[in-house]
């Protein structure tokens, strides 16, 4: 076994069970382990939305129990400039961004990685992500986590092989119940804490309430694919393709009780377009165009190849053919039609267990 005692690892302690167990596992492997708690969001009200102080207290309790020190760092300014402003501008343009992917790219594996290496003298950083790393021919590949239910490689496709080489993912080799069991055995403060859901800076609060603070709502008509106005939306930004809940419309006068789904957004005219049935042709795509490409451990593609793709987190892999259009744009053709392919979201590509990389969905291709 290699001697890790000279290697210093800074663990991103979120106050959750995964990072807690990651710190423990690394300590068991002999590394010098130090915790770092990142504050990425400044609350502007006194409500209970943000649990940052509770998370910090949990992280501190875990570090005390494990006998490691905990540093704190405030990245709120970097987060606002590099993640949140982009998030707002995408919503304004009628797209649906994924801020967690940008947060990993700009904060956790950039600002945090740089701070850990330069200010804290780290050899590695570690996080509680459910992914694995494999080193081949001097390059680090990103692999799916062993726990298929929890695999988070979708959120990390923007990392370079250099960033992956400086990162450790201790729980990536484990199933989630196993991780909880370790935390319970050690009696860690986070052992029974539920997994955080939703976007990091919104927490558990209602998305529409949060967004309306930053972007003025602009109501407009809800129109069927046949051109009939059947309701009013409170703002296109509150809706995403494939959405069913929160439309406030019942069956049609013809009597069909099939639920309504958002099938398109006409941003120029502020119209929300809906249809009945989750397999309506307007909801289905046969492919997509992606841009802002990033390949983890391979050169940019020059010819078509076969792989699988996910167009959203926790979706089953879709077999597809990827064809380069130019240096930063590809066409992806699915083997079968796929519902709710959403511009602004990420398309992430896989070859078996290896995450190849991905890009931002620019447009969807329909029959």
Swiss-Prot record:
Instruction: State the compartments where it is located.
Output: Cytoplasm
Binding annotation for ATP: 12-19, 38, 128
Q: Which family does it belong to?
A: Belongs to the MnmA/TRMU family.
Assembly mode: Interacts with TusE.
Name this protein carries in UniProt: tRNA-specific 2-thiouridylase MnmA
Q: InterPro entries, per this entry?
A: MnmA-like, MnmA-like_C, MnmA-like_central, MnmA-like_central_sf, Rossmann-like_a/b/a_fold
Biological role:
Catalyzes the 2-thiolation of uridine at the wobble position (U34) of tRNA(Lys), tRNA(Glu) and tRNA(Gln), leading to the formation of s(2)U34, the first step of tRNA-mnm(5)s(2)U34 synthesis. Sulfur is provided by IscS, via a sulfur-relay system. Binds ATP and its substrate tRNAs.
**Single biological process term from Gene Ontology:** tRNA wobble position uridine thiolation
One of the entry's Gene Ontology molecular-function terms is: tRNA-uridine 2-sulfurtransferase activity
Its catalytic activity?
A: S-sulfanyl-L-cysteinyl-[protein] + uridine(34) in tRNA + AH2 + ATP = 2-thiouridine(34) in tRNA + L-cysteinyl-[protein] + A + AMP + diphosphate + H(+)
């Amino acid at each position: 076994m290699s001697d890790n005692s000279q290697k210093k690892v800074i663990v991103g302690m979120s106050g959750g069970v995964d990072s807690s167990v990651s710190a423990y596992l690394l300590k068991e492997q002999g590394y010098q382990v130090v915790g770092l708690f990142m504050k990425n969001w400044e609350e502007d009200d006194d409500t209970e939305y943000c649990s940052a102080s509770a998370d910090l207290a949990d992280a501190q309790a875990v570090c005390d129990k494990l006998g490691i020190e905990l540093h704190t760092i405030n990245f709120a300014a970097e987060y606002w400039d590099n993640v949140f402003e982009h998030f707002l501008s995408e919503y304004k343009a009628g797209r649906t961004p994924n801020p967690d992917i940008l947060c990993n790219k700009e904060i956790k594996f950039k600002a945090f990685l740089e701070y850990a290496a330069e200010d804290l003298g780290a050899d590695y950083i570690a996080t509680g992500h459910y992914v694995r790393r494999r080193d081949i021919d001097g390059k680090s590949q990103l692999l799916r986590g062993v726990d298929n239910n929890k695999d988070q490689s979708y959120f990390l496709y923007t990392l370079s092989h250099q960033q992956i080489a400086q990162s450790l993912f201790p729980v990536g080799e484990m199933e989630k119940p196993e991780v909880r069991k370790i935390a319970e055995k050690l009696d860690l403060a986070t052992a029974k804490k539920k997994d955080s859901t939703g976007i990091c800076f919104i927490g558990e609060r209602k998305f529409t309430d949060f967004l309306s603070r930053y972007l003025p709502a602009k109501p407009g008509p809800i129109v069927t694919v046949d051109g009939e106005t059947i309701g009013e939306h409170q703002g296109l930004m509150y809706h995403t393709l494939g959405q069913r809940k929160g439309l406030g419309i019942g069956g049609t006068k013809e009597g069909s009780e099939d639920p309504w789904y958002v099938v398109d957004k006409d941003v120029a005219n502020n119209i929300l377009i809906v249809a009945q049935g989750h397999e309506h042709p307007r909801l289905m795509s046969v492919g997509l165009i992606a841009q802002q490409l990033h390949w983890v451990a391979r050169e940019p593609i020059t010819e078509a190849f076969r792989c699988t793709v996910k167009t959203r987190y926790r979706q089953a892999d879709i077999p597809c053919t990827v064809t380069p259009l130019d240096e930063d744009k590809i066409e992806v053709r699915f083997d079968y039609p796929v519902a709710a392919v959403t511009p602004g979201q990420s398309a992430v590509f896989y070859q078996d267990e290896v995450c190849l990389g991905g890009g931002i969905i620019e447009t969807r291709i329909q029959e």
